[in-house]
Swiss-Prot record:
CDD domains: SIR2-fam. GO terms for molecular function: histone deacetylase activity, NAD-dependent; metal ion binding; NAD+ binding. PROSITE patterns: SIRTUIN. This is NAD-dependent protein deacylase. Residues 1-269 form the Deacetylase sirtuin-type domain. It comes from Desulfosudis oleivorans (strain DSM 6200 / JCM 39069 / Hxd3) (Desulfococcus oleovorans). Its EC number is 2.3.1.286. It holds the Pfam family SIR2.
């Protein structure tokens, strides 16, 4: 099936849907300028997520070479600060407004789905702009740009980059006064909202797998769960189809290119034009 036909078929499927769900990965955020682990020459080539992705590794790296780690972190902050929702994000909001999309299940922590307007977002890896109390487990969300500005200011005024100094710069809980940490999943930690994600997959009539390779489990099982429950599975990824076993329609394009075209055709189909 060529790309034009695949886009038309995807539009026909979505035009008849009322409970579609999205499963999005790093490829969607990459189109907003946020590098993936695979991007050559990016920050992750110098900041190995396998070394700093868990709590113990992060602490060890801070002890060993704090200046390098903080410099890389500041670079990442600049990347997240500059990112904006791309046409793919905005197309998903269009699908929600049309009553087609019921949930976005995402592995991304950048808050861009919410900023584009989607209201039902299930974050399996957490949110980088939300903090969780280490004691009472309460959560507090922050506006992305304001939080990045405060973090950069605090880091620039620290007496040193020791773990104690850095963690002392974290916000305190409004409820109990204890320390807080970013509400994200580190390597080795339990993925969040698994039950909600799989429930959304089981209840959807169409599953859109966007910009994800289907490698990381248990999240990678979500499209298969949707397929087993009777949903059509549409995969949009320019690099590979990691869900070939369950895929009904594959579109080898970037989501920011494919989704606006699909949504445009959905509108025409629904209007009868």
């Amino acid at each position: 099936m060529n790309l034009d036909n695949a886009i038309h078929e995807a539009a026909k499927v979505l035009a008849g849907a009322s409970r579609a769900a999205v499963f999005s990965g790093a490829g969607v955020s990459a189109e907003s300028g946020i590098p993936t682990f695979r991007d050559p020459g990016g920050v992750w080539d110098r900041l190995n997520p396998a070394e700093v992705g868990d709590t113990q590794g992060l602490l060890a790296s801070l002890e060993k070479n704090p200046e390098k780690l903080v410099a890389m972190f500041m670079e990442l902050l600049a990347v997240f600060d500059a990112a904006i929702p791309n046409p793919g994000h905005r197309a998903l909001f269009d699908l929600e407004r049309m009553g087609i999309l019921q949930a976005v299940i995402t592995q991304n922590i950048d808050n861009l789905h919410q900023e584009a307007g989607n209201t039902q977002v299930i974050e399996m890896h957490g949110n980088g702009f939300r903090f969780r109390c280490l004691k009472c487990r309460s959560r507090r969300s922050h506006e992305r740009h304001a939080l990045i500005g405060r973090v950069k200011e605090r880091l620039s005024t620290l007496p040193d980059f020791s773990p104690a100094s850095i963690f002392a710069a974290m916000p305190d809980c409004d409820l109990c006064g204890s320390g807080m940490r970013p509400d994200v999943v580190m390597f080795g930690e339990t993925v969040m909202e698994v039950e909600n994600a799989f429930a959304a997959a089981r209840s959807c009539d169409v599953m859109l797998a966007l910009g994800t390779s289907g490698v990381v489990t248990p999240a990678a099982q979500i499209p298969a769960e949707a397929k087993a429950s009777g949903a059509k599975v549409i995969v949009i990824n320019p690099n590979e189809n990691g869900f070939a076993r369950v895929c009904d329609i594959y579109i080898s394009m970037k989501t920011g290119q494919a989704l606006p075209r699909i949504v445009e055709q959905v509108k025409k189909i629904r209007s009868g034009s």
